Amino acid sequence: MGNAPSQDPERSSPPMLSADDAEYPREYRTLGGGGGGGSGGRRFSNVGLVHTSERRHTVIAAQSLEALSGLQKADADRKRDAFMDHLKSKYPQHALALRGQQDRMREQPNYWSFKTRSSRHTQGAQPGLADQAAKLSYASAESLETMSEAELPLGFSRMNRFRQSLPLSRSASQTKLRSPGVLFLQFGEETRRVHITHEVSSLDTLHALIAHMFPQKLTMGMLKSPNTAILIKDEARNVFYELEDVRDIQDRSIIKIYRKEPLYAAFPGSHLTNGDLRREMVYASRESSPTRRLNNLSPAPHLASGSPPPGLPSGLPSGLQSGSPSRSRLSYAGGRPPSYAGSPVHHAAERLGGAPAAQGVSPSPSAILERRDVKPDEDLASKAGGMVLVKGEGLYADPYGLLHEGRLSLAAAAGDPFAYPGAGGLYKRGSVRSLSTYSAAALQSDLEDSLYKAAGGGGPLYGDGYGFRLPPSSPQKLADVAAPPGGPPPPHSPYSGPPSRGSPVRQSFRKDSGSSSVFAESPGGKTRSAGSASTAGAPPSELFPGPGERSLVGFGPPVPAKDTETRERMEAMEKQIASLTGLVQSALLRGSEPETPSEKIEGSNGAATPSAPCGSGGRSSGATPVSGPPPPSASSTPAGQPTAVSRLQMQLHLRGLQNSASDLRGQLQQLRKLQLQNQESVRALLKRTEAELSMRVSEAARRQEDPLQRQRTLVEEERLRYLNDEELITQQLNDLEKSVEKIQRDVSHNHRLVPGPELEEKALVLKQLGETLTELKAHFPGLQSKMRVVLRVEVEAVKFLKEEPQRLDGLLKRCRGVTDTLAQIRRQVDEGVWPPPNNLLSQSPKKVTAETDFNKSVDFEMPPPSPPLNLHELSGPAEGASLTPKGGNPTKGLDTPGKRSVDKAVSVEAAERDWEEKRAALTQYSAKDINRLLEETQAELLKAIPDLDCASKAHPGPAPTPDHKPPKAPHGQKAAPRTEPSGRRGSDELTVPRYRTEKPSKSPPPPPPRRSFPSSHGLTTTRTGEVVVTSKKDSAFIKKAESEELEVQKPQVKLRRAVSEVARPASTPPIMASAIKDEDDEDRIIAELESGGGSVPPMKVVTPGASRLKAAQGQAGSPDKSKHGKQRAEYMRIQAQQQATKPSKEMSGSNETSSPVSEKPSASRTSIPVLTSFGARNSSISF
């Protein structure tokens, strides 16, 4: 039932599969010679719906692959050459054959390329699997990456643009060697490499991808059934676990599809040919050792004929004759070089016809050592079946595999698989490592003919433990499988438990990677005699005897052959290969492992002799050391340690299981913690959201429950109804008017008589409209009152915004007035100077004026952009003119009337300057000194203040000074002097004392002043009233001109009256524009809402330039300059006497009066601009 004949035409067919071909089941191609019944058949699976080509690699891809695996190739070449040289030196008679084999291996650009497949039909039964094994022996460490996809009909080529994996989309990354998304899908013995360029977003996508990659075997329904598990490999811990979250899938993830089905479910028998070993290493793991294939030489098709390949003597180990890459195992030893499929064991196949068949399964010698570090859960069967190596003489058992992982190597024997004894010993538990995860698919493809036919001797085909643990995570778990009855306990079976549980053959079946893996443990302690060895049909002594069968050979005692010659040849080959293995291991892997298995193997060699029959005695004694623990002592005591071996192995196995369980527990706890954290975070989020929602809902409800809001809503609804009614009435009235006009035109032009009913109808409509309109008008007052109630809040707000700054200003001015009065009284008390009665008379107008100014909200307003006037501009030049005449008007200062008030201001300034000097040194004094200084300074200030009022004696009259006089700072508060836009410090500051002294002297009301613009706008007004455009460079000149004007013309304008007469300037400073506009809007709103209510008088904005001009113009016509000059001279004389008593005041005063710099403010003088009433008023408080 071989399929090789069907492959020959397929091989000669065009290389690409058509879409129609894809609908047929995959072809299962054999590497080991297509002819001869396909006896070397290796299963190849073509991917359905995928076009595959014989040569998919482009030259660039091949070169890139070689470049990527350059390092591994170099190492592999070195090891292979060393091994071949060793073989040639050991077997000089076969040097030519070895050299040819070596050359063939070198010729292959990539040792994975299955070029020989194209010539399989010409090789017949002769080429031998040795050649192919040699070609396939290079298991690159990047095997899944760098294998030549030229020959593989599996559709895994990166360059295969015809591959149509469902979730894929082609991108530029496809051309890169290491595509960003590579998935390895394992099902049974097949591995598919898939390039994923998009994230697998759901399990359905993954199911579709898997079903597409395995179309003949898996469907979406099967994948979603509970009998199917999808496992993903944890590379860090080298275990497979069930895939629950597709986000775990990453680049280079290995996904295994596990079908919990009967043994044959997935693989019909027609796919198997003569039970040959079809498990070539098609996909070795990426980490696999480059040399693991060197010795994987398994029987070629000549095994079917029972004769060695023609070119090689039968004495040569079959590993040299026939290389079966089929049995190699793919180990996923996360990151480590996995061991080889099995030791280089070459057993003579036993056939009924007696013709010896060199059946050997020879893994890389280095694999024996490599396997020791493979972790429990390396599931390899999905990629390639391990060899079933029956535990023969025990010389070649894999000690590390036995101890560390329960891997079975399968070597299918020719013959009926089910003719094996009824004991049910499917596989002797030989090299436990060789079948790491040997799936049912693997077993069936290899052993259908030799394992699964009905056994003549009876006995359970599957042991009691079949399916006992469906998804075992590691082969170690196989030891727990219950054994079928019918045999003595296996005293040293690698995984056998206590003898009471033992059985002649314990079978453990792993359901894994798509179907069940069969693990049969063969108790090495099974008693077999030489006689039973010679009996062909003895069930206990033969594993798979039967007519025309080959015995299963592998690690462990050789199966008793029916032919003594076959047995002897097997033993001889076993010994030779054992010694070879030891030498090669020591040569290639010297120091790589703590102990070399060569000791064990040679020790086991001593346990059996070439002439020893394949009896149970030799078998039990030989099998013990090989399955013993790794230490060499195990091999040195071949017969004495079956129990110790079993216990030690069980301990190691149990320890591994405990570690795995503890790891799983830790992961489970982590998952629980994560879940709890997620729950907490979700709870917190829900609480936050709930609180936020409840707050918003309560806020909305509160807004609706707010009586004002409810009333506003009701009033708005009523207003809308009113407007609708009004609109309706208007419309009806329009219609009525039109109809009446039409009737009138008809009557006037056409002299048509209008019928009475029509007129009555119009009259009725008009009457109804009148009534409705009357009702509407009657309804309006109620609506108006309601709206006023609702809008009262807005009206109050507007009023508040309008009046509050003025109210604050008024309160502030009253405070200033009280302060001035108190200071004056105190000074009078201190100095004993009492004001004359006429001065007292001037106080009452002050208070009256202050109140009237406050009530009328009239202030001297200075916008922020223009700095306040400086005392030096008003007073300084006058002083300088009187003392040190300057410029072209040396006598103008004598004409000014306010000499005494100027001198009083000078004394105030002297006191202030003295205070600033002391304040600058405040930090140097203690608290006592500070208090003393404060008292002195306050006394000096209070002494200077009454002099200001002396002007009132000489100039009685209305004095609206409190409006404009900033409060004195008794504690010496100061602020930075204001700076002009041109950069000059406030050279035009208007200090309070100067204003106070000048105002009383402004008797006649001035004419309406011209509007002027602040100098910051580049506009100013000259003495004659002309508007001059100036730049910043001219600002100094303008200020000088203004100061000269003020020298000549001392302002006599009554500010209150002047301000009230001045219309609002058309061009207000920029900062004032918005405020004035807002005030206009507020005035309009209030005027509309308050029917008949008086609106607040608008603000008047007067720029400092305008006030200066007004003062100058008003002063021009002053008639009593001479009187003022006399008063000033008298006051100056008195003041000089007062200052003589105070040296500090005298010094500062002389500096102020005589220094020509007195026109500019001192650096320490400061003025605080007071911004009130929306920034409209800007008075300056100077110290």
Swiss-Prot record:
Instruction: List all membrane-crossing ranges.
Output: none
The UniProt entry's coiled-coil ranges are 654-674, 726-746
> For the region Disordered, what residue ranges are annotated?
1-44, 284-379, 466-643, 861-907, 949-1032, 1058-1081, 1105-1183
Instruction: Report the locations given in the UniProt record.
Output: Cytoplasm; Cytoplasm, Cytoskeleton; Cell projection, Axon; Cell projection, Dendrite
Give the principal location in a single coarse category: cytoplasm
Gly residues composition bias: which ranges? 31-41
Q: Where is the composition biased (Polar residues)?
A: 286-296, 1135-1183
> Where does tissue-level expression of this protein occur?
Expressed in some primary breast carcinomas where its presence is significantly associated with increased tumor size. Not detected in normal breast tissue.
InterPro entries on file: AIP3-like_C (IPR022782), SRCIN1 (IPR051825)
Point out residues bearing the modification Phosphothreonine.
T52, T624, T637, T884
Q: How is it modified after translation?
A: Tyrosine-phosphorylated in response to EGF and to cell adhesion to integrin ligands.
What is the protein's quaternary organization? Interacts with the N-terminal coiled-coil region of SNAP25. Interacts with BCAR1/p130Cas and SRC through its C-terminal domain. Interacts with CSK, CTTN, SORBS3/vinexin, SYP and MAPRE3/EB3.
Q: What does this protein do?
A: Acts as a negative regulator of SRC by activating CSK which inhibits SRC activity and downstream signaling, leading to impaired cell spreading and migration. Regulates dendritic spine morphology. Involved in calcium-dependent exocytosis. May play a role in neurotransmitter release or synapse maintenance.
The protein's name in its UniProt record: SRC kinase signaling inhibitor 1
Q: Which organism is it from?
A: Homo sapiens
